[in-house]
Amino acid sequence: MSAKPNYETMYILRPDIAEEEVESHANKYRDLVVEAGGEVIDSQMRGKRRLAYNIGKHREGIYIQLNYSGDGKQVGPLEKAMRLSEDVIRYLTVKYEGQHSSLGRSTAPANPMASNTPRTEGQEQAKTEPQTAPA
């Protein structure tokens, strides 16, 4: 039996919500993962940070990172709940092929897509044909 893959969901909450609401959201999303058959590995409050660009009218956001393992069925309900929440302004889920350590670092390759990136026919042709300068 193979090990379940690991997932990391980073989500950003509105900066103007109360500390109790932040904890409530974090607990709700952890519970959703467990209810869907996943196992929460780690949940970290990254704090309020300035966004790289405005999201809606928000210039800051409260970052929370959720690491969990599962068979993939946890991602859909989790992201649906985040999408429907007015307090979540952005979220992203990443699947890790390697095992996650307790420190939140993956033992997977630094760039897992580098060797697995499919090329289109035009990209392969451009690599194999020599480039000549126009006359």
Swiss-Prot record:
One of its GO terms (biological process) is translation. InterPro entries: Ribosomal_bS6, Ribosomal_bS6_sf, Ribosomal_S6_plastid/chlpt, Transl_elong_EF1B/ribsomal_bS6. CDD domains: bS6_chloro_cyano. It comes from the Bacteria. Binds together with bS18 to 16S ribosomal RNA. PANTHER family: MITOCHONDRIAL 28S RIBOSOMAL PROTEIN S6 (PTHR21011), SMALL RIBOSOMAL SUBUNIT PROTEIN BS6M (PTHR21011:SF1). This is Small ribosomal subunit protein bS6.
